[in-house]
Amino acid sequence: MNSVIHYSTSVAVRKASRFLFTSRKFCNGSIGGDVTDNGTEEPLKITWESSEMDCEFDQEENGEKISVRKRFMESTKLSASRVLDTLQQDCPGFNTKSALDELNVSISGLLVREVLVGILRTLSFDNKTRCAKLAYKFFVWCGGQENFRHTANCYHLLMKIFAECGEYKAMCRLIDEMIKDGYPTTACTFNLLICTCGEAGLARDVVEQFIKSKTFNYRPYKHSYNAILHSLLGVKQYKLIDWVYEQMLEDGFTPDVLTYNIVMFANFRLGKTDRLYRLLDEMVKDGFSPDLYTYNILLHHLATGNKPLAALNLLNHMREVGVEPGVIHFTTLIDGLSRAGKLEACKYFMDETVKVGCTPDVVCYTVMITGYISGGELEKAEEMFKEMTEKGQLPNVFTYNSMIRGFCMAGKFKEACALLKEMESRGCNPNFVVYSTLVNNLKNAGKVLEAHEVVKDMVEKGHYVHLISKLKKYRRS
């Protein structure tokens, strides 16, 4: 810690490092140990880009202006629906290729996207093999059409389908095809692979493949290693991060602030405190000043280590060197201290946040509320919940989940159910964690009928129907 005194006042706030704000990561995880997929949905973010559609050209038709772009999209969606209907007829003896040819649809990147997304939406455990085959069959058919060339996004979307189907070898073959067709693999390509293959225990093989790749387009990162490290951190491959870092040094690449932040954070998560501070010293010796994210890692370490005084000293040091702590740093402290059960210290830093002119945001309030709930102090959590709404901070799905869990722990199921309705009326859609928290607690309390009412309501609204089996002993009637 003494080496911190030698830091210069330069603060390099790097946008690419924003994932290192660990208090924000709090709102991406399950709260209170609910066993679910962290309660988060991971919608595929595929953007449609077409230079031909950068502008909208309106024309007069039947006395009304109709957007050419809008008509194109509506026509494409209709074509996609026809394609999906045709693909569903695929079976032995049915010539799918000829049937698709007879549709005479206009092939475009948007059509490919609509069809593949349509397949992805219908994918289930029972039909995953069929979905993978249909997606690839359609993909190949499109690629064979005159004057059409797949985009990198189309490849990534098909990779996503293969990933959901557990077709790891098919994913790797698709990447080979992608490279053969002249497409550079990107950080997005790697991220899709590592997210899937990491779960299958193939992460190191994938990393080695990309390290050796000559077609890996790692921009906007400084070098390929930073792109790889960034993706590994996103899937919590902390041990592999250390290995990649050593490989990077052996290959003669120099780390930068982003590199150090990632490796330090990984070592923090692995509980390797000594190595964390050795890396910090290396960073300073290499002439790099710690940025806001570096300080956030250190604050998180001190907070989870139950060292509020040392954390306070670090905050003061930050001010001395010209780095003004923000709400994110105070939130990190509150989060770490609440996990250590130090609720009084949490309240102190919450008040300190306001004193220094920072406005606690929804994440800060949610961390504080969750701390109170975990500590069995429901009344204080309710007061904090009321305070945040009065100050214009609208509760998010994680805030509501904490409060619902708190009411359930206190046996106040009527209030918990009322809060579920309140969040829906406010336009805050419950995620699966919220439903499972309420349903499982109701069942554990012997309130089976009430639990089934919640599930029934969830199903009627079309929410998470594919995850019903994860709710304890639930059977659809």
From Swiss-Prot:
<feature type="repeat" description="PPR 7">
    <location>
        <begin position="361"/>
        <end position="395"/>
    </location>
</feature>
<dbReference type="InterPro" id="IPR050872">
    <property type="entry name" value="PPR_P_subfamily"/>
</dbReference>
<dbReference type="Pfam" id="PF13041">
    <property type="entry name" value="PPR_2"/>
</dbReference>
<protein>
    <recommendedName>
        <fullName>Pentatricopeptide repeat-containing protein At1g55630</fullName>
    </recommendedName>
</protein>
<feature type="repeat" description="PPR 3">
    <location>
        <begin position="221"/>
        <end position="255"/>
    </location>
</feature>
<dbReference type="InterPro" id="IPR011990">
    <property type="entry name" value="TPR-like_helical_dom_sf"/>
</dbReference>
<dbReference type="Pfam" id="PF12854">
    <property type="entry name" value="PPR_1"/>
</dbReference>
<feature type="repeat" description="PPR 8">
    <location>
        <begin position="396"/>
        <end position="430"/>
    </location>
</feature>
<feature type="repeat" description="PPR 9">
    <location>
        <begin position="431"/>
        <end position="465"/>
    </location>
</feature>
<keyword id="KW-0677">Repeat</keyword>
<dbReference type="InterPro" id="IPR002885">
    <property type="entry name" value="Pentatricopeptide_rpt"/>
</dbReference>
<comment type="similarity">
    <text>Belongs to the PPR family. P subfamily.</text>
</comment>
<feature type="repeat" description="PPR 6">
    <location>
        <begin position="326"/>
        <end position="360"/>
    </location>
</feature>
<feature type="repeat" description="PPR 5">
    <location>
        <begin position="291"/>
        <end position="325"/>
    </location>
</feature>
<feature type="repeat" description="PPR 4">
    <location>
        <begin position="256"/>
        <end position="290"/>
    </location>
</feature>
<dbReference type="Pfam" id="PF13812">
    <property type="entry name" value="PPR_3"/>
</dbReference>
<feature type="repeat" description="PPR 1">
    <location>
        <begin position="151"/>
        <end position="185"/>
    </location>
</feature>
<feature type="repeat" description="PPR 2">
    <location>
        <begin position="186"/>
        <end position="220"/>
    </location>
</feature>
